[in-house]
């Protein structure tokens, strides 16, 4: 009984580890797409986009959606501050 319980707990740890790796990979891909799509062309807007991506990188797991929203909002604000040709592309 003890051997079976320890084996099943090892299997649970492996599956949790795999799901964490997947969420961090998808977070990185969303984060990189935010930096490509949302950016400014002058002033402080690149800094604003960088702050949004840093927030997206800190929030892992459920923060994937939150980081995407923050990056998009910051890109739009940076575009409004910089001019009509800047923002999310």
Curated annotation (Swiss-Prot):
BP GO terms, sorted: sorocarp development
Coiled coil: none
Family, similarity comment: Belongs to the hssA/B family.
Species of provenance: Dictyostelium discoideum
Name this protein carries in UniProt: HssA/B-like protein 15
